[in-house]
């Protein structure tokens, strides 16, 4: 076989060279020579893109129209400004030995509104699921260089691309569901695959972010009937049009490159996924997952959680408009000091994090006070826990209070339950409260009793404690205790809800998944965890808190809760109707109103910030962040524990009749909380 003539450096034969010369026309490449656009592709890829575009136009399998071709992995798509490309936006992207075909404008011309992704969305989604080496090179380093001349400007390859381009005009866009498909063509095997593309709300070309405003923050509770008695959802998870592959996929997954089934789990059919969001010089991993009885259900639940995480990390649906000091805003804004601040020692050890000052200008977003029934400005960092700029995050919030639902009322209910749950857990842990123990065998739910028995089969006793402190809302602390006292000793969880059965099941779900894994994780990470047990200052991250309690030597810090063996009380007795229980309605609006009344009646406000992503709204979902200033916030990292400095930590147990006096510093648990 005679090798092709490569003297021109293109890897193409004479006939192909002629076709390219005949068909080539000037095209608008993503990289411009005058420097006004994004950085250009390396010359080798720029030439390859021009040649492929020319062959596509000349291909008998195509339509004869001009097609823009661009390279991926040659510039930072997550930071560059949009390039007005009009109808010549790239419909073919090349990278490695692959070609991505699409996305395409809708036939009715509705391309830049209504949630139809553009080629820039594809480039951004593609980059977001690449490996760290490539992302660091594009986003932090000096970029990438071509390893050689791409050999793909040959007719039999471009004919395949052209056929896919032509085929899209015959497809019914509705057949793909809520999101359109792009096609991945392997240029070595010609194998083609379809991948769903979710629009990027932050896309500078077609993103649907809207300016934040007090009008947009207005919030009115409306009827939200539950889909069945005993549920606290307006519809079951199965009713959402939720294509998992659109969110967890290796090409352009909106929530990461894939979802993993934990086939080794001995309790639930757990799944886990992860996406990475840049925070300065490092990529922050954000995990999401589901813990149901089947992997299919766990995948769907996990995607919903992943969307909730993405919505709460930074303002993707709305763009903040207010930057001012608290002193300038006055009572139009929430004073973040009511939510707790770090000690001076933290800021001395972390000088990059600038402490809050009333005179310092910060970014604010609009929320809505359900108590005062008015819009209220809230510090961005209290709502979006990965807001840009580490130095601006005078506190590092978490997803506490962030929740999703099929209606705003559903989302508010679950967000408020989470805030109440974390507050009660921290009060009990740091206040070393003696809590009534619940008999799980008195549960009316056979699934609860069966899971407790399953944990016992694997060597764990599941124990549950009534953790109601201030509010008439059932909160249950769940603990899985390894019965032989070995590594993987303790595993904690919690649940809250107006239905005590649901609250107990929520805590059980957490420990059922984690308990069967904590032994192996604690053994693998034993050296680091033992260093934490000896010096709590080394407890730095979220996972450190639960994992360190996998060590037997940490069990003594939970003896206030687990060391005594009183009677286990039946649920019917503990949760009998009365002053410490709220009635349950068939409508979530009524449930929310009763809960808000209980919280505001105790002297607190309830603030709601709408975090809903455009793609969530397209699916009929809503996400909110619920903030109750004055309740204890959950923090991760021993130096960050705001709860220990807040007035409520000293007064709440006494006010609830659980302590004879207010707590002093030496009354508090000296060990980090074990909340997962």
What is each stretch, according to the model?
Residues 116-120, 124-127, 159, 163, ...:
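Residues on a specific face of well-ordered alpha-helices
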Residues 157-173:
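Internal hydrophobic alpha-helix adjacent to the cofactor/substrate pocket in enzyme cavities
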Residues 2-4, 20-26, 73-78, 82, ...:
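Helix-biased "structured C-terminal domain" signature
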Residues 40-43, 47, 446, 590:
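Alpha-helix boundary/N-cap detector
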Residues 5-17:
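Small-residue-biased low-complexity repeat regions
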Residues 2, 21-31, 42-159:
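E1/E1-like adenylate-forming module used to activate ubiquitin-like modifiers
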Residues 105-116, 169-179, 389-390:
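Intrinsically disordered, low-complexity coil segments
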């Amino acid at each position: 076989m005679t090798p092709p003539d490569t003297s021109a450096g293109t890897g193409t034969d004479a006939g192909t060279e002629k076709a390219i010369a005949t068909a080539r026309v000037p095209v608008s490449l993503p990289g411009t020579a005058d420097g006004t656009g994004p950085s250009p592709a390396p010359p080798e890829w720029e030439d390859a893109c021009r040649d492929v575009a020319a062959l596509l136009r000349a291909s008998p399998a195509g339509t004869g129209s001009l097609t823009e071709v661009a390279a991926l992995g040659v510039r930072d798509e997550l930071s560059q400004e949009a390039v007005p490309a009009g109808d010549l936006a790239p419909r073919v992207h090349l990278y490695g030995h692959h070609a991505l075909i699409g996305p395409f404008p809708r036939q009715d011309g509705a391309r830049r509104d209504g949630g139809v992704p553009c080629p820039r969305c594809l480039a951004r989604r593609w980059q977001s699921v690449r490996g760290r080496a490539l992302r660091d090179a594009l986003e932090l380093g000096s970029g990438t260089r071509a390893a050689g001349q791409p050999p793909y400007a040959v007719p039999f390859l471009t004919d395949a691309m052209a056929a896919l381009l032509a085929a899209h005009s015959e497809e019914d866009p509705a057949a793909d569901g809520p999101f359109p498909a792009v096609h991945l063509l392997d240029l070595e095997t010609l194998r083609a695959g379809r991948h769903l593309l979710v629009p990027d709300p932050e896309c500078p070309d077609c993103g649907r972010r809207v300016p934040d405003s007090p009008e947009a923050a207005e919030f009115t509770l409306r009827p939200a009937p539950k889909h069945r008695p005993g549920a606290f959802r307006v519809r079951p998870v199965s009713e959402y049009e939720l294509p998992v592959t659109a969110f967890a996929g290796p090409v352009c997954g909106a929530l990461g490159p894939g979802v993993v089934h934990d086939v080794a789990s001995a309790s639930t059919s757990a799944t886990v996924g992860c996406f990475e969001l840049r925070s300065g010089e490092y990529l922050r991993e954000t995990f999401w997952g589901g813990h149901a009885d089947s992997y299919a259900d766990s995948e769907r639940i996990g995607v919903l959680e992943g969307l909730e995480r993405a919505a709460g990390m930074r303002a993707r649906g709305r763009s903040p408009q207010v930057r001012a000091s608290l002193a300038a805003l006055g009572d139009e804004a929430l004073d973040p000091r009511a939510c707790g601040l770090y000690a001076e020692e933290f800021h001395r050890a972390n000088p990059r994090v600038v402490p809050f000052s009333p005179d310092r200008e910060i970014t604010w977003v609009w929320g809505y006070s359900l108590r005062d029934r008015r819009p209220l400005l809230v510090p961005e960092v209290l709502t979006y826990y990965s807001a840009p700029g580490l130095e601006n995050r005078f506190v590092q919030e978490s997803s506490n209070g962030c929740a999703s639902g099929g209606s705003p009322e559903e989302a508010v209910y679950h967000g408020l339950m989470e805030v109440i749950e974390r507050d009660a857990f921290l009060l009990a842990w740091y206040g070393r409260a003696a809590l009534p123990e619940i008999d799980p065998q008195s549960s009316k739910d056979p699934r609860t009793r069966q899971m407790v028995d399953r944990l016992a089969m694997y060597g764990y006793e599941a124990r549950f404690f009534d953790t109601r402190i201030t509010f008439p809302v059932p909160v249950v602390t769940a603990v899985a205790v390894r019965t032989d006292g070995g590594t993987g000793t303790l595993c904690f969880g919690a649940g809250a809800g107006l239905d005590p059965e649901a609250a107990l099941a929520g805590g059980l779900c957490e420990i059922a998944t984690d308990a069967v894994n904590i032994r192996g994780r604690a053994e693998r990470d034993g050296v680091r965890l033992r260093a934490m047990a000896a010096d709590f200052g080394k407890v730095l991250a979220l996972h450190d808190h639960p994992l360190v309690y996998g060590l037997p030597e940490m069990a003594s810090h939970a003896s206030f809760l687990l060391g005594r063996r009183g009677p286990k009380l039946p649920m019917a007795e503990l949760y009998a109707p009365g002053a410490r229980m709220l009635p349950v309605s068939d409508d979530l609006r009524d449930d929310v109103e009763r809960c808000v009344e209980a919280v505001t009646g105790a002297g607190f406000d309830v603030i709601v910030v709408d975090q809903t992503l455009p793609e969530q709204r397209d699916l009929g979902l809503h996400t909110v962040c619920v903030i109750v200033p004055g309740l204890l916030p959950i923090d991760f990292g021993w130096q960050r524990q705001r709860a220990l400095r807040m007035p409520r930590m000293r007064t709440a147990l006494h006010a609830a009749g659980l302590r004879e006096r207010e707590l002093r510093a030496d009354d508090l648990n000296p060990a980090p909380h074990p909340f997962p």
